[in-house]
Regions:
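Catalytic pocket-lining loop regions of alpha/beta-barrel enzymes
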Residues: 2-4, 9-174
């Protein structure tokens, strides 16, 4: 319910909240970046508050993007390791649909998904965009994904995790 979410965001900010978070899935099965959600991103931009993607328990049918038939519901370790993929998919959809061009002051935060993966993802996102620059691409971006990330995105890092300190140094110092 985008209209309801937009109203709730405005109410919460008027009550003192400084941002909001969304689950890494949608009940409509439309990705976060889809234009159907533009009213919410526009309201966040208008209110000058960030929106974060935060993990949470996902309904069974939504969680299973499973390629393997032998891993059932008893594979909780496996599914927990892959939990960040839902957050990544939601994150990537903002680029796929050009949200950062439509809302140049919109701020997006990625929470609780580690940060060690973001460098490789930005490299890949930029490379794929460049390789598709012949007009046949489906990515409607005016700039490189890494440019939008540096300007409009933040990611939480846990310096106790193996990859995050290296990523932290690269993003902060580089």
């Amino acid at each position: 319910d985008i209209a309801g979410a937009t109203q709730e965001l405005e109410r919460a900010v008027l009550d003192g909240c400084r941002g909001a978070f969304v689950a890494p899935f949608t009940l409509s099965s439309k990705s976060h970046g889809h234009p159907d959600h533009d009213a919410l991103w526009g309201k966040a931009q208008e209110l000058d508050v960030p929106i974060a993607i935060h993990p949470m328990a996902e309904p069974g049918p939504i969680t299973r993007g499973n390629r393997f038939r032998d891993l059932g519901n008893d594979a909780s370790w496996y599914y927990n390791v892959l939990a960040r993929q839902g957050i990544q998919q939601a994150f990537y959809s903002f680029f796929q649909y050009g949200v950062f061009d439509r809302f140049p002051r919109f701020k997006l935060v990625v929470l609780e998904a580690g940060a060690g993966w973001i460098g490789a993802s930005l490299d890949r996102m930029d490379a794929v965009r460049d390789s598709m620059a012949d007009g046949k691409q489906s990515l409607p971006l005016k700039e490189l994904p890494s440019t939008y990330f540096r300007r409009q995105c933040w990611i939480s890092a846990d310096l106790a995790q193996v990859g995050d300190p290296l990523c932290h140094r690269g993003i902060i110092e580089g």
